[in-house]
Amino acid sequence: MAYSACFLHQSALASSAARSSSSSSSQRHVSLSKPVQIICKAQQSHEDDNSAVSRRLALTLLVGAAAVGSKVSPADAAYGEAANVFGKPKTNTDFLPYNGDGFKVQVPAKWNPSKEIEYPGQVLRFEDNFDATSNLNVMVTPTDKKSITDYGSPEEFLSQVNYLLGKQAYFGETASEGGFDNNAVATANILESSSQEVGGKPYYYLSVLTRTADGDEGGKHQLITATVNGGKLYICKAQAGDKRWFKGARKFVESAATSFSVA
């Protein structure tokens, strides 16, 4: 009777490594978790009729052992190898979803909720753990408008809610200070404005840089998202000081403001 045996040795042949290094760069290689040498021996009995069967059995075991010992790289999945297509997708840990009354927004994960009330109709406020100048606010107020476009252009809308841009620390007449006009202690420059339809509703987006003569971090970058739904004006405002804006806060402010939507 014929039989075969296969043995796995955890050592690589020098000749095998040499052949692998000399093969064409266009060929696909299967990397091994450990160097594996596979040796199969087939014993032939006196029965000649069973010799072919023994050789086939040995080859089958050889292929099976090679498949078990190999480690498929992720790139091999493109060529038909098994892929972890049912694996859990990666989640963005930089933000946490917040579902409010009639709205939802992505909040930076390292920002804390705050009880400070700064604006009329404020229902939500989060602040940066290290700098309260970086914060997120959501305001909901009644309106007789049917759509955000009833306020006019994005710039005209901003002029009607300019209280969102903050208050200066000095009131009264001044000579020109820090490049400001006479009697002016604050400026607001609209860097960008746009209108976009989401879920069948128009939204206004504005990016504003405000500066005050009393010098607050050189200015604040304020991003505003606004829409109207069900007789209510929804406004989301996220901001960061100019210094932190360029040190990484920008992505958190922009992502939070643009994630805002109403139900």
UniProtKB/Swiss-Prot annotation:
Fetch the InterPro entries from UniProt: Mog1/PsbP_a/b/a-sand, PsbP_C
Q: Where in the cell is it found?
A: Plastid, Chloroplast thylakoid lumen
What GO terms fall under cellular component here?
apoplast; chloroplast; chloroplast envelope; chloroplast stroma; chloroplast thylakoid; chloroplast thylakoid lumen; chloroplast thylakoid membrane; extracellular region
- GO MF term list: calcium ion binding; mRNA binding; poly(U) RNA binding; protein domain specific binding; salicylic acid binding
Thylakoid among the record's keywords? yes
Keywords associated with the record: Chloroplast, Phosphoprotein, Photosynthesis, Photosystem II, Plastid, Thylakoid, Transit peptide
Taxonomy, superkingdom = Eukaryota
Q: Which GO terms describe its biological process?
A: photosynthesis, light reaction
Which residues get modified to Phosphoserine? S153
What is known about what this protein does? Answer: May be involved in the regulation of photosystem II.
Assembly mode: Interacts with WAK1.
Which family is this protein grouped under? Belongs to the PsbP family.
Name of the protein in its database record: Oxygen-evolving enhancer protein 2-1, chloroplastic
Gene source species: Arabidopsis thaliana
